[in-house]
């Protein structure tokens, strides 16, 4: 059985591309270290990657992709990771909060009707990610199974833009 998707794998690739200069995230007006990169990793998949960047180093990142609608509203799945050197400092929590505010600011005016969800599916055994999701999305997650791996997971959901 495969493992639950690990956002840290994508973070390593993002970090390498940032250092090599093959990607150029744009600065966000809301936070001096917050940058965003919009890309299409595969046909039909739009991805927004937010990162706290200093010089050519990403300290933490959060990736948003469109997921299945929830309660008739758009839903974005979020995954996040922090560079090993910066873990335990609250950066992932700060980044998820800052990136959700930026996403809400840019997306809300474009929606046909108000409101969209952000969802994190977190492995039941991932204590660090559960803390971040509890602090940023919901204090009352729903027990579920990860669709890809079948492993026990928790679903954290937050409604934005209303």
Give, region by region, the residue ranges found by the protein language model.
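A short beta-loop-alpha structural element at the N-terminal edge
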Residues: 1-20
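Conserved GNAT acetyl-CoA-binding A-motif
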Residues: 105-121
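Conserved active-site alpha-helix within GNAT-family acetyltransferase domains
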Residues: 117-142
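Conserved acetyl-CoA-binding loop-helix of GNAT-fold acetyltransferases
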Residues: 88-105, 131, 135
